Amino acid sequence: MSVLTPSYQCEPVSLEWGQTWPPRDVFVDLAAERRVIPVVRRVLADELSAVGVYRQLAHGNFGSFILESAEHGGSWGRWSFVGASSAGAIVARDGHAQWIGSHPEGALEEGTFLEVVHSALDALAAPAIEGMPPLTGALVGSLGWGIIPEWEPTLAATAPKESDIPDATLVLATEVAALDHATGSVYLMAIAWNLNGSADGVDGAYDRAIERLDAMTAQLASPIAPAVLGSSGATPPQVRERTARADFESSVNAAKRAIEDGDAFQIVVSQRLDVSTSAS
């Protein structure tokens, strides 16, 4: 994967609450060197959670997501990221990957998963901007077990295909909110992706990014009915196990014997659990 080293280096960014970066002239300079530019506005929203921000901004949009992590001891990490919308996605099934929606010109539209991902990263690679949140534009998604042969061809997929869930999905995020739990700040980001690689339309791209930021700011400030759920009278969902209990215990015992015999030092036996839901 190639890494771009542009000649234009912007200064470290330090935003006050309510401030938007970059100004138009800096955006124009950045557009001459890179195909990914985050237009960012910092707001104070210390009473909001990632789930609350998702409800206000995403509304189940295509390619929306929540990305966060827990630290040791059960506390949340400093950053939570809410993807409100995406321009396109790389979807992989059965050894073949392709873009749906918009994709970067000059990058492979289809191929193996690794070929398509590497091609997109090469086309859109850009250095980080100091002072910005650690995620300001990325491919975000999930990788399933079915994608393992891409890295390790000797582990060919032999299990039957039992669902239509893709082996991997990575979305190209266009609107992201980064919650900084240390300062109570939310960085709203309208990410300008130059998908066609053209120098035309820079001013229009900036204007559209500002319009998107204004809309996100208004959505975040709008009241929303609280989602309060209780268990009183609710029927517990039926959990369906992929593997019968006796078969699962047999696999556990076989794993223990393999470890005792020195054939392995660690084996994790798992199975899929299915629950029906009307959520979307």
Provide a role label for each language-model segment.
Residues S2-S280:
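Extended alpha-helical targeting/anchoring segments
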